Amino acid sequence: MITYDDEVVCAPRAGTLYDVLELILDRGMVIDVFVRVSLVGIEILKVDARIVVASVDTYLRFAEACNRLDLEHDVRSKTVPEMFGSPMAKTVGRAGARRTARSLTDKVRDVLTPEHEHEEEPEEAEDRPRAGAERGRSTQRPRSRPAARPRDEDDRPRSRPRRRTEEEDR
């Protein structure tokens, strides 16, 4: 049983929908959700949602008590476009572009060099000592491809001689 200050006894009764809504609007019901998902310091997802079933006065009292009246941008958090606009991201992008260009030039060089040069390269590679075996104090890194040399007119790519088939040799 419920008793009030007036010492009036009220029997519990089933409330109507109107009574429930009046109680909710009077006291208010606020579901406040703030979710931030970060991976290694990079903010991937940020959700700030409020579901409010309350009177305006109740909501304003709640927001003021929780310091959630305004949803401003947090200067400490970075968004994905800000991450890609940073100088660090630009240098990483340049390095990737350089690697891609290098691999493309290697592929073109492989296609344009005659095949008999490719057959000699494995023998030369066996004769040379491995770079990992000699751990000297050199200042240069071992190169994975031959050093670039100045180009002359004789260095232009030439067409490959056509191979003869067995039938043509007879």
UniProtKB/Swiss-Prot annotation:
Q: Please describe what this protein does.
A: Gas vesicles are hollow, gas filled proteinaceous nanostructures found in some microorganisms. During planktonic growth they allow positioning of the organism at a favorable depth for light or nutrient acquisition. GvpA forms the protein shell. It is not clear what function GVs perform in soil bacteria.
Question: Would you tell me the Gene Ontology cellular component terms?
Answer: gas vesicle shell; vesicle membrane
Top-level taxon in the UniProt lineage: Bacteria
Query: What InterPro entries does the annotation carry?
Result: Gas-vesicle_GvpA-like, Gas_vesicle_GvpA, GvpA, GvpA-like_CS
Q: Which family does it belong to?
A: Belongs to the gas vesicle GvpA family.
Q: Which PROSITE patterns match?
A: GAS_VESICLE_A_1 (PS00234), GAS_VESICLE_A_2 (PS00669)
> This chain belongs to which protein, by name?
Gas vesicle protein A2
Q: Which organism is it from?
A: Streptomyces coelicolor (strain ATCC BAA-471 / A3(2) / M145)
- Chief subcellular location equals other
Q: Which PANTHER family match?
A: GAS VESICLE PROTEIN A1 (PTHR35344:SF4), GAS VESICLE STRUCTURAL PROTEIN 2-RELATED (PTHR35344)
Q: Name one Pfam family in it.
A: Gas_vesicle
According to the UniProt record, where is the region Disordered? Answer: 86-170
